[in-house]
From Swiss-Prot:
Molecular function (Gene Ontology), one example: UDP-N-acetyl-D-glucosamine:N-acetylmuramoyl-L-alanyl-D-glutamyl-meso-2,6-diaminopimelyl-D-alanyl-D-alanine-diphosphoundecaprenol 4-beta-N-acetylglucosaminlytransferase activity
Cellular component annotations (GO), alphabetically ordered: plasma membrane
Residues holding UDP-N-acetyl-alpha-D-glucosamine: T14, G15, G16, N123, R166, S192, Q286
Topological type in the membrane: Peripheral membrane protein
Function in brief: Cell wall formation. Catalyzes the transfer of a GlcNAc subunit on undecaprenyl-pyrophosphoryl-MurNAc-pentapeptide (lipid intermediate I) to form undecaprenyl-pyrophosphoryl-MurNAc-(pentapeptide)GlcNAc (lipid intermediate II).
Chief location category: membrane
Protein name: UDP-N-acetylglucosamine--N-acetylmuramyl-(pentapeptide) pyrophosphoryl-undecaprenol N-acetylglucosamine transferase
Chain's gene name: murG
Highest taxon, organism lineage: Bacteria
PANTHER family from the UniProt entry: GLYCOSYLTRANSFERASE, UDP-N-ACETYLGLUCOSAMINE--N-ACETYLMURAMYL-(PENTAPEPTIDE) PYROPHOSPHORYL-UNDECAPRENOL N-ACETYLGLUCOSAMINE TRANSFERASE 1
Cellular localization per UniProt: Cell inner membrane
Single GO biological process annotation from the record: carbohydrate metabolic process
CDD domains given in the database record: GT28_MurG
Annotated catalysed reactions: di-trans,octa-cis-undecaprenyl diphospho-N-acetyl-alpha-D-muramoyl-L-alanyl-D-glutamyl-meso-2,6-diaminopimeloyl-D-alanyl-D-alanine + UDP-N-acetyl-alpha-D-glucosamine = di-trans,octa-cis-undecaprenyl diphospho-[N-acetyl-alpha-D-glucosaminyl-(1->4)]-N-acetyl-alpha-D-muramoyl-L-alanyl-D-glutamyl-meso-2,6-diaminopimeloyl-D-alanyl-D-alanine + UDP + H(+)
Length: 356
């Protein structure tokens, strides 16, 4: 379309990067949007066909051996030049990225051409790419005010917007599961990639919750070898579940990792949560994310190393017997929610990339 604005979105790898980017894209129907991703990553399944997907071969910049560190550097410069060429040939006015290693070559390619580069950082502890490249960005949008403490610089153009979420989180329909309205519901989720350790802890104790009258929806991810081991009509097991909005709005308790997008969804659905941060996350950033909700009284956190099946079982049983506690946690979560994040980020993009 003549005069249509063109935007390249660079988001790859996990739901934490992809879902916020998709939420923003849906707020920009007047833009021609293309997607930059990595071969064989989750975006190849999630990105709708109306966003042309351009994939590159890139494995990030971390490595243990000298060769493992050198090879990604060669890949990085290859991706940089590919992205630069894509921006020029496609006449894109700018790049929007949600972080991760695909963000680095995308930001640098855009700025080398004098194009707009907008970065959204969801984590309370900004990732290395954000800390290194924020000064190069036209604007950095933040998922939480907690991130400001790590990005103190007069050179940075920062806005706290919250983390964009899938539309069904904000506008849930009916939950298409046969769960009675009056029973307590526990939802277990390990993020877009699942969590084998959480799966094992839950299966060691879930019978206690079922005996107490609760229903459990357990989202295991695709790498769950023990899925058939427990059979119970009130224990519903899925690798993933869509849409998540109705499920989280119905949940009384969530047991979850502490990815930034997941925590945004928990606040927007006012779901009390027991958080078990992924212990191998870069710079332990999930613990920093979880601490934001813990300080607000919206969640409790236990390190995976300190948790057993018995302890997990007892904590949840105690919560089930304390409805006032759960109600207070839900209200505290609601106070943290930022429901207009997608629109805020989209409006910032419109201001920086106006109609030609």
């Amino acid at each position: 379309m003549l005069g249509q604005r063109k935007l390249l979105i660079a988001a790859s790898g996990t739901g934490g990067h992809l879902f916020p980017a998709l939420a923003v894209a849906q707020e920009l129907p007047e833009y021609e949007i293309h997607w930059l991703g990595v071969r064989d990553r989750l975006e190849n399944q999630l990105i709708p066909p109306h966003y042309p997907l351009h994939t590159v071969n890139f494995s990030g910049l971390q490595g243990k051996t000298p060769w493992a560190k050198l090879r990604p550097l060669w890949q990085f410069w290859g991706v940089f030049w590919q992205t630069r060429q894509l921006l020029k040939q496609g006449d894109f006015q700018g790049v929007f990225t949600t972080g991760g290693y695909i963000a680095a070559p995308a930001i640098l390619a855009a700025r080398s051409l004098g194009r707009v580069a907008i970065l959204h950082e969801s984590n309370a502890l900004p990732g290395k790419v954000t800390r290194w490249l924020a000064p190069w960005c036209t604007l950095v949008a933040l998922g939480t005010p907690a991130s400001l403490a790590y990005l103190q610089s007069k050179r940075l153009n920062l806005r706290v917007t919250g983390t964009p979420v899938r539309p069904d989180i904000l506008h849930p329909g009916n939950l298409e599961l046969p769960i009675p309205k009056a029973v307590p519901l526990i939802v277990v989720m390990g993020g877009s990639q699942g969590a084998v350790a959480i799966n094992r802890l839950v299966r060691a104790t879930v019978h206690r919750w079922l005996e107490a009258g609760a229903w459990v929806v357990h989202l295991t991810g695709n790498h769950d070898l023990d899925a058939p081991t427990i059979q119970h009509p009130h224990y519903l097991v899925f690798p993933f579940f869509e849409p998540m909005g109705p499920l989280l709005h119905r949940a009384d308790i969530a047991i979850s990792r502490a990815g930034a997008s997941t925590l945004a969804e928990l606040t927007l659905t006012a779901t009390p949560a027991l958080l078990i941060p992924y212990p191998y996350a870069a710079e332990d950033h999930q613990t920093v994310n979880a601490e934001v909700l813990v300080r607000a009284g919206a969640a409790e956190m236990i390190p995976q190393s300190a948790l057993t099946g018995d302890r997990l079982g007892q904590i949840i049983l105690e919560w089930l017997g304390q409805p006032q506690k759960l109600q207070a946690m839900a209200e505290n979560a609601r106070q943290l929610a930022m429901p207009n994040s997608s629109q805020q980020v989209a409006d910032l993009i419109r201001r920086l990339i106006p109609a030609p």
